């Protein structure tokens, strides 16, 4: 990352989201080796002429957050500069296929998405992102094969939040509430404020297991981390009845 910055190319990295956004892209503008910090552009909370501001993240915190999504980085720059970095061709192609597969998924081209991700895994069997995305596509079809792909993703990257969340969602759909709770909990242990709706899901599976106090706490956290949730009123009424 620092090598790229030193070459004058501001990399775009994939980082965890907040509230009801599970992921976001951020431009890294620099670093400070003395202070051990990373500089990145973040959107202004209030409209302004520039619309962006520079944020500072402690280096260790940044590394932890970046690792949750496989340390993905997008580089935009002159071909001669990019090629001088001498990236692993198979890894680069594998990561590119991951981005292309997400586009195919949005276009509802499921078969093409699966083929693209399988090719990504063939090119780089250690690509935790490709394995997790493939698990996600199969999960949408309620295909139990998704479990093995999520588990392989976690073997490659123990901090893969989305793999644990995906397992939690799969087991919830199949009413295996104890397994669902376990995986949601693992995700929350990795990052407790990345995605507010995960608390609603864990609250539901705990409620189904008659863990009412824990369920209530999860619903409260859902409102805390997702204050603008469309179903906030319904959740608050449910809390009053619990």
What are these regions (language model features)?
Residues 1-40:
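Active-site-adjacent substructure of cysteine-protease-like catalytic cores
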Residues 31-129:
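Noncatalytic regulatory segments and standalone regulatory/sensor domains
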Residues 133, 166, 200-201, 234-238:
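Canonical tetratricopeptide repeat
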